[in-house]
């Protein structure tokens, strides 16, 4: 695989808490004065001009000085640090753990402390994860602090808990004696300080209970020699010391702010940084930072400790994937600004050529000028729409995918149905060796010839094809070769494998554990490589296209130059370890040798020819290891550098082996869980109405009125399809002035409500399908997030306030239409985006009382309908000239633009204003936007597109061209009236 990502679009790094570099000295008074002049709120505290200060910024723009704090261990255990009540409480809890361990019998310690440790680990990854997730999305903890008023000075008379206030103030000011005032610090900072004390309790108890569990399980294996015991303990202590160094170096880089997830509460005016251990491994605090767990497991010589360590490590990666990474992407990796227009060739504007798509122009980073040569445009890589890799890209209509599936089924059948005799074992091993030779030598020869002579491309050009066809055929050939190479190896391994008769004998269990870990490591490495290179780099696209790509080192390539050199083959050695058979060891060895030869003889020469001096010599891991060596050793080069590179890459990545399986498993689990939740939504059953609803409120005071964007006239006309009886074909007679409400798909809907003046501040309005609720007085189905609170601050969530416009505007009795003499409260809210149903149907709004599901008012039912696009309204069906096609495409553009804007929530950052304007990059990140557009296009035009097509087209004009072309291609198979010279339909006869 390429040694770096050859892509013009560089994604920011995966994101961690490793990001803070100390700020340069600043003039504090000048900064405060400038901020105050600009209108920011600036908190003041006592400080000297000689100090180097770090500034924090709250979400409301308040700038404050972040005082220096100490790490958890120093704060608790150092005798030089002042102790407060919370410190003593943490130490007391730790002492209770030790007393419990001492009081229990040796037989009882293992199950008891296993349960205690799992409780604290669940509190860490589940409890802290839940708090941080809600703080990130809804500002929950800060809202709790605001509602409870625990940080409000009791002298104001607004704090209901003055004792707690004084306790917190004394505790925090004792912990931070310098540059900190409890009363003057921002609410977010004080909330973070309380949160970190809560974290201290969990982290210390988590580690203490783990160590006590390891002590309880510790033993010396039977028949173990003294030398083996010494080696086992020495290796264990090396891992523990390495773990300690990783944690200390990580804390040196990120400080307490990121260590305790401070950016979930406020931000520091500093830049992201990758220094020290963060240049050596991805997510070091969660990957190599858990090496000590395996060192302790090694010293304890206990499988119980090993497996509980793996579970804990996996839970930590789940915390990273589900909580930290989404927050980092949202805060530090915002979508880049989008292009506002696309330049088009004048030839494409003057005439529409059915054989040429404008989409190829939009792929280039810079639009081609007018008159660009077609040959030059062919040098650009094709837009990747229908990818090959991944189960979600599996398409049995594609010959490559169907061939791969059929061949895999054949290999599976032969493997299972044939006996494991020496003859068949030899046959399967030989087959695996042949496929490995083809995959490395045969594919390598093709790429070498392509690099020097463009031989693969020339072959297809000779027969009248273009570079795109050559590229597609190459991807299919390479994909088939790769899958057969690994499928044959798995089949050979299966034939050579024999189940252990006694799992407790020897190292059988350890071999299987390490073997599957190595296989998981290879899977994660492959996924990381694909994420960094993309489809273009994975299939060696720079051998086929001379695109002016910028060499970037992102993802796994930040730390390693050639991750596939060792880590990409870890699974082969894992299989060799599990089977312990010479034939599999031979296959793993020959695979490794051929892969190294492929990199050295094929990839490296091409990369040097293509990128020259821009190639990096040392990766982040090697660079940091060299820094730690004495100067004489740093001068060594050549083979010594290569040996060090390979050796340390293997050791470093082996410690990270628990992550890949979890990352894949968690994503699959979350997708399955979300699918189940959508299919079986949570239901709330209420047996009777709330007493206060029946006693204290008049339902006539509650009302809901809705306003929305009316759907197109075609949606109204389609309600009469001509299939009705004679009486039903005429327009319906209305006895009132209210007409049916039919709104646009995805358009915001404004809801106006009224309620009594003393209505509950926790009232809320939800959106439902009419058919989902059978009772009018009680709602029996979850709103699934489609609800808005009537008042701000009533709930511990910001999401439920999104769309709230006004609240509790008093309507005098004189303005009431029903003649009642009571004043009313009123408000407005707008449902848009994720608070809407993205489908067609009939819906209603329901006003609910006091955070419950008692219904006080129901709106008029309304319909969401997408009108179908009718070509006959644009041009005569018999006109087949190019001018007709141009008119139809223009009409499609006009009809499609407002729909696309609605699908993109009318967000100015992503929604286009014109036909040529690029979609925002958030469309590529979040697949929901493309899926909305695909559904609308299918309903409007009868053309089914894949979401990837929307992202690849990039603007409305390209989509309109694709839809117009698809309709022409599908016209012979359409069930609608023909445009050809066939017998006229009844309607055509009448018109003539």
From Swiss-Prot:
Pathway assigned to this chain's UniProt record: Phospholipid metabolism; phosphatidylcholine biosynthesis
Stretches assigned to the Lumenal side: 1-84, 133-197, 247-279, 324-403, 448-477, 546-581
GO MF, any single term: phosphatidylethanolamine N-methyltransferase activity
Ranges annotated as biased composition (Polar residues): 1-10, 709-719
Topology of this chain in the membrane: Multi-pass membrane protein
Membrane-crossing residue ranges in chain numbering: 85-105, 112-132, 198-218, 226-246, 280-300, 303-323, 404-424, 427-447, 478-497, 525-545, 582-602
Keyword Metal-binding recorded: no
Reactions catalysed, as given in the entry: a 1,2-diacyl-sn-glycero-3-phosphoethanolamine + S-adenosyl-L-methionine = a 1,2-diacyl-sn-glycero-3-phospho-N-methylethanolamine + S-adenosyl-L-homocysteine + H(+)
Region annotated Disordered, chain positions: 1-27, 41-60, 708-733
One Pfam family matching this protein: PEMT
Record field: compositional bias (Basic and acidic residues): 11-21
Primary location class: endoplasmic reticulum
The protein's Enzyme Commission number: 2.1.1.17
Keyword Methyltransferase attached: yes
CC annotations in GO: endoplasmic reticulum membrane
One example of a Gene Ontology biological process annotation: methylation
Broad enzyme group: transferase
Family: Belongs to the class VI-like SAM-binding methyltransferase superfamily. CHO2 family.
Function of the molecule: Catalyzes the first step of the methylation pathway of phosphatidylcholine biosynthesis, the SAM-dependent methylation of phosphatidylethanolamine (PE) to phosphatidylmonomethylethanolamine (PMME).
HAMAP family tied to this protein: PEMT
Listed name of the protein: Phosphatidylethanolamine N-methyltransferase
UniProt source species: Talaromyces marneffei (strain ATCC 18224 / CBS 334.59 / QM 7333)
Gene: cho2
């Amino acid at each position: 695989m390429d040694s770096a990502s050859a892509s013009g679009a560089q994604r920011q790094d995966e994101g961690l808490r490793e990001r803070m570099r100390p700020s340069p000295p600043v003039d504090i008074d000048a900064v405060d004065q400038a901020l105050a002049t600009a209108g920011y709120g600036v908190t003041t505290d006592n400080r000297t001009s000689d100090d180097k200060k770090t500034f924090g910024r709250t979400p409301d723009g308040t700038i404050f000085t972040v005082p220096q704090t100490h790490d958890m261990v120093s704060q608790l255990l150092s005798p030089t640090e002042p102790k407060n009540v919370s410190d003593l409480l943490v130490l007391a809890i730790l002492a209770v753990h030790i007393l419990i361990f001492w009081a229990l019998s040796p037989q009882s310690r293992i199950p008891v402390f296993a349960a205690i440790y799992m409780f604290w680990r669940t509190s860490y990854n589940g409890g802290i994860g839940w708090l941080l997730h809600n703080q990130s999305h809804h500002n929950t903890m800060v809202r709790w602090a605001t509602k409870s008023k625990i940080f409000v000075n009791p002298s104001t008379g607004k704090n209901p808990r003055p004792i707690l206030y004084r306790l917190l103030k004394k505790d925090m000011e004792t912990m931070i004696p310098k540059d900190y005032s409890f009363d003057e610090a921002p609410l977010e900072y004080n909330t973070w300080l309380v949160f970190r004390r809560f974290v201290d309790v969990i982290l210390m108890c988590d580690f203490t209970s783990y160590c006590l569990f390891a002590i309880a399980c510790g033993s010396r294996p039977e028949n173990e020699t003294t030398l083996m015991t010494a080696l086992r303990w020495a290796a264990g202590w090396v891992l523990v010391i390495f773990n300690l160094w990783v944690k200390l170096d990580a804390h040196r880089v990120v400080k307490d702010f990121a260590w305790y997830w401070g950016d979930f509460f406020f931000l520091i005016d500093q830049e992201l940084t990758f220094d020290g251990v963060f240049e050596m491994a991805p997510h070091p605090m969660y990957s190599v930072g858990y090496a000590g767990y395996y060192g302790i497991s090694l010293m304890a010589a206990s499988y119980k400790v090993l497996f509980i360590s793996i579970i804990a490590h996996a839970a930590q990666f789940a915390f990273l994937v589900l909580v930290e990474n989404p927050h980092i992407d949202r805060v530090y990796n915002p979508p880049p600004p989008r292009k506002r227009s696309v330049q088009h060739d004048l030839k494409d504007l003057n005439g529409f050529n059915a054989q040429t798509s404008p989409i190829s122009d939009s792929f280039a980073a810079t639009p081609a000028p007018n008159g660009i040569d077609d040959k030059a445009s062919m040098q650009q890589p094709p837009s990747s729409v229908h990818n090959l890799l991944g189960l979600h890209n599996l398409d049995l209509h594609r010959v490559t995918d169907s061939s791969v599936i059929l061949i895999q089924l054949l290999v599976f059948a032969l493997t299972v149905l044939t006996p494991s005799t020496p003859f068949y074992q030899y046959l399967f091993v030989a087959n695996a060796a042949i496929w490995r030779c083809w995959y490395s030598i045969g594919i390598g020869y093709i790429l070498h010839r392509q690099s020097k002579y463009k031989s693969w491309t020339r072959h297809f050009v000779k027969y009248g094809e273009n570079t795109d066809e050559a590229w597609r055929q190459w991807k299919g050939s390479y994909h088939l070769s790769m899958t057969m190479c690994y499928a044959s190896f798995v089949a050979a391994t299966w034939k050579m494998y024999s189940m252990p008769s006694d799992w407790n004998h020897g190292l059988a269990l350890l071999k299987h554990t390490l073997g599957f870990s190595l296989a998981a490591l290879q899977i994660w490495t492959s996924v990381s490589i694909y994420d960094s290179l993309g489809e273009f780099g994975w299939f060696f696209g720079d051998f086929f296209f001379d695109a002016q790509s910028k060499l970037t080192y992102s993802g796994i390539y930040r730390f390693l130059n050639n991750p596939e050199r060792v880590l990409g083959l870890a699974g082969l050695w894992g299989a060799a370890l599990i089977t312990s058979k010479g034939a599999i060891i031979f296959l793993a060895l020959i695979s490794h040798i051929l892969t190294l030869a492929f990199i050295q003889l094929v990839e490296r020469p091409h990369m040097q020819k293509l990128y020259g001096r821009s190639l990096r010599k040392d990766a982040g891991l090697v660079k940091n290891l060299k820094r730690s060596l004495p100067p004489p050793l740093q001068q060594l080069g050549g083979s010594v550098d290569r040996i060090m590179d390979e050796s340390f890459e293997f050791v470093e990545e082996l410690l990270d082996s628990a992550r890949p399986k979890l990352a894949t498993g968690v994503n699959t689990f979350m997708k399955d869980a979300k699918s189940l939740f959508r299919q079986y939504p949570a239901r709330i059953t209420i047996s009777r109405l709330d007493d206060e609803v029946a006693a204290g409120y008049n339902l006539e005071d509650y009302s809901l009125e809705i306003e929305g964007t009316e759907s197109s006239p075609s949606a109204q006309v389609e309600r009469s399809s001509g299939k009705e009886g004679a009486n039903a074909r005429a327009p319906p007679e209305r006895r009132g002035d209210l007409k049916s409400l039919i709104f646009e798909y995805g358009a915001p809907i404004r809801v106006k409500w009224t309620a009594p003046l003393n209505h509950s501040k926790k009232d809320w309005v939800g959106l439902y399908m009419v058919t989902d609720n059978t009772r009018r007085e009680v709602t029996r189905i979850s709103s699934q997030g489609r609800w808005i609170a009537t008042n701000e601050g009533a709930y511990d969530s910001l999401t439920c306030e999104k769309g709230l416009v006004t609240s509790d505007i008093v309507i005098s009795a004189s303005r009431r239409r029903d003649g009642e003499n009571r004043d009313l409260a009123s408000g407005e809210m707008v449902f848009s985006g994720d608070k809407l149903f993205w489908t067609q149907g009939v819906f209603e709004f329901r006003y609910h009382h006091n955070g419950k599901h008692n219904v006080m008012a129901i709106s008029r039912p309304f319909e969401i309908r997408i009108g179908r696009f009718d070509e006959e309204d644009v041009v005569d069906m018999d006109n087949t000239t190019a001018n007709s096609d141009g008119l139809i495409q223009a009409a499609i553009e006009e009809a499609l633009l407002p729909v696309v804007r609605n699908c993109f929530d009318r967000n100015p950052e992503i929604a286009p204003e014109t036909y040529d304007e690029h979609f925002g990059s958030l469309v590529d990140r979040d697949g929901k936007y493309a899926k909305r557009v695909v559904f609308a296009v299918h309903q409007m035009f009868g053309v089914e597109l894949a979401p990837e097509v929307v992202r690849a087209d990039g603007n409305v004009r390209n989509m309109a061209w694709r839809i117009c072309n698809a309709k022409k291609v599908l016209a012979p198979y359409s069930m609608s009236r023909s445009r050809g010279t066939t017998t006229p339909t009844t309607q055509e006869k009448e018109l003539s």
